[in-house]
Amino acid sequence: VNLGEVGFLNAVDPADAVETVERLLAELRAGDPLPIRGLDRLAVTGAAVDPAINEIVIQAPTRGAAAPLALTIDVDDHRYLQTRADGVMVATSTGSSAYNLSEDGPLIHPAVPAMVVTKMADRAHHPAMVLPTTAAVQIAVEGPSEAVVVSDGRTRTTVALPQTVTVARHGTSVALVEPTPHYFDALEKLA
């Protein structure tokens, strides 16, 4: 309930939360199946942050032209690109409708098993890359002195540079009861 502004984890307005939970509990007691979807999570090595349902962000402590990071991004040990940017995020399909979308990343249907690498204020304007959830994204970060690694906008840690951070699918998923079961009903919030 209300974990973001446009993302799909806030399918219920706070004013409707009690009524929605009561309806779902009544359906459960009646033996009706609940609309449950498994959510992939992202795990990080190279920085101490919690697994993420939406995205992992690696960014400069301050954003803007004065503090870009030098990023080398490999996917499964193959070079994807080198660039200078304010940061980079790796988002799940569910997270593609949140911060990723605000950074001009693609919107991915939540049933598609994918993750997306989106650069933040990329100086060379590289497009985002959609990857399978089996991929491991290695991000070598260089910059003035440090970077911040953030999981779902909630847990963060500062890392000294240079540092390599790897983002990959976590071994377990999270079950989500979806009171708005159809993806396109939730898209109305993006208009």
What name fits each language-model region?
Residues 2, 56, 153:
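A residue-level signal for conserved active-site and pocket-lining positions in enzyme catalytic cores
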Residues 38-40, 52, 65-69, 84-86, ...:
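A generic structural signal for well-ordered coil/turn residues at beta-strand boundaries
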Residues 4-9, 108, 124-125, 174:
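Short gly/pro/ser/thr-enriched loop/turn and capping motifs at secondary-structure boundaries
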Residues 6-79, 85:
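Catalytic core of DAGKc-family lipid kinases
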Residues 75-76, 125-191:
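ATP/nucleoside-binding phosphotransfer catalytic cores, i.e., glycine-rich phosphate-binding loops
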Residues 44, 73, 95, 149-150:
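Short aromatic-centered micro-motifs
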Residues 81-125:
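Gly/Ser/Thr-rich active-site loops/lids in small-molecule metabolic enzymes
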Residues 1-2, 111:
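Short hydrophobic/aromatic-enriched beta-strand-loop microsegments
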